[in-house]
Amino acid sequence: MTPSSRRGASPRAVDGRTPTRLVVGISGASGSIYGIRLLEVLRDVPGLETHLIISRAAKRTLVDETEYTVRDIEALATRVHDDRDIGAAPASGSFRTAGMVVAPCSIKTLSALANSYADTLIARAGDVTLKEGRPLVVVVRETPLHVGHLRQMLALAEMGAVVLPPVPALGRRSTLLPMLS
């Protein structure tokens, strides 16, 4: 364990073995509630250990956008790692995880991931996730998008990541349709 990580109670997998680990990154894009809500849902999954990394920009954005404090959000995770600590456990391929979700994913973080520019722990953990062939999901909230953004998304998708814009489901009989009219 690195000095920058906070150790919480480690859940055990349902079968008693090592818990399943998922890395959650919250970057500085608007939409920090997506990462917060993800952590709230994951907290109730038996045998799941969440490793949270919050960027410096995200710490500012989430205070502007939500009623949560950084401490509130950190309390939702099993472990918290400092984004400046590129030597933390999620930076290593030997740290087995089920994958990583970056929600929201800023264009800066998207670009770092698409170009293997691992200057932060979020970028390094995402790079390791891709290199190890594990699932990486990026929730890119930016809009509108210019061609440079789209090229970065394409590059990341070609590497195996899932680019998941947070678009509400408006299919047949959606409960959201009446709210929009």
Which residues fall in each region the model found?
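A cross-family phosphate/adenosyl-ligand binding-site feature
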Residues: T2-V137, R141-S181
